[in-house]
Amino acid sequence: MQTPLQSPPEGRPRLLIVDDDALITDTLTFALGTEYEVLACESRSHAIELLRQLPEPPALALVDLGLPPTPHAPDQGFRLIADLLAHSPGMRIFVLSGQNDAAHARHARALGAAEFIAKPCDPAALKKILARALTVRDAEMRAERERARDAEELIGQSPALLKLKSQLAQFADS
């Protein structure tokens, strides 16, 4: 059996769920566990502790706004969004919360959340949202790798660099 401190198995991206309601985390783990390696936490502090132990961060996170010690206020959830992005800027964070007024949704997005999803939500719709986010993330990562490779080729083959390499080779021979 795999422990959360190991890398996720190939083909199953890691999903962090942070919600203080065990019924929610259990239901989401059951609904999403075939597509994702689900890691569930009940608080901001537990999520941060877990992140520090992982060899690589989760690709996705579902975050409730109302977390202990103030479950009826969004402060801990907002702080967690900032914490997650500071730890892993490429992580896609989705707020899944019953505290779904427009101001909270705007603030969560301003902090870097990809989307705000109101509770209760349809698990099938949530699966589609997460799958789409992974597709976009993977495309962005491929494009970034290609840009880096192209830049390396450009720099490595520029006329000035080729001339310098030639001069260094001549100098090394003397």
Question: Across the structure, where does each feature detected by a protein language model lie?
Answer:
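Two-component/phosphorelay signaling modules centered on CheY-like receiver
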Residues: A22-A40
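Active-site beta3 strand of CheY-like receiver
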Residues: P55-L67
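AAA+ ATPase active-site-proximal loops
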Residues: R145-S174
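Short amphipathic alpha-helix used as the core "switch/output" element in two-component signaling
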Residues: E49, P71-G90
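Short hydrophobic/Thr-rich beta-strand motif most characteristic of the beta2 strand and flanking loop
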Residues: E35-L50, H72-A73
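C-terminal output helix
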Residues: A103, C121-L130
